[in-house]
Amino acid sequence: MPQLTKNYIDTGKVSIEIHDFPLTQIHSGALMAAQAANCSAEQGQFFLMRKTLFDGVVNKEWRDGSLDDLTTFGNYAAAIGIDRAQFESCVTTNRHLAQVKADLAMAQQLGINSTPAFIINGRLLMGAQPYDEFAKIIDAMISPP
């Protein structure tokens, strides 16, 4: 992703939108984690929290969306410089739940059933892909006819 960001997003050639697709059938706490990432965005730390959440699930630091997970997410927030009280209030009041659920419904309508998934100008690209695959598709779309 850093190379894509540098060559396409930072140069203004393309823009990026990130939508939630919490895999609750695998991680029952994924819905809370998606909300935690969005609550972190309110304080300018979306990407760092997102990485922290992914690292945390891999390390089995959280799992089921319980109060223990909320405590873990609050610890993550504090560690990356987020106001913990504001963050926890955002998560516990489900401030972003409607948007997360709307993103999930949109993904399901598009036939997305796993992550990662990418939509590039209407074209669905499933699974992790090398930089060259993204570059080939993007270059074909932005090149003059």
Named regions from a protein language model:
Residues 1-7, 71-145:
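C-terminal cap of thioredoxin/glutaredoxin-like
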Residues 1-78, 110, 139-145:
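Structural alpha/beta surface segment adjacent to cysteine/selenocysteine redox centers
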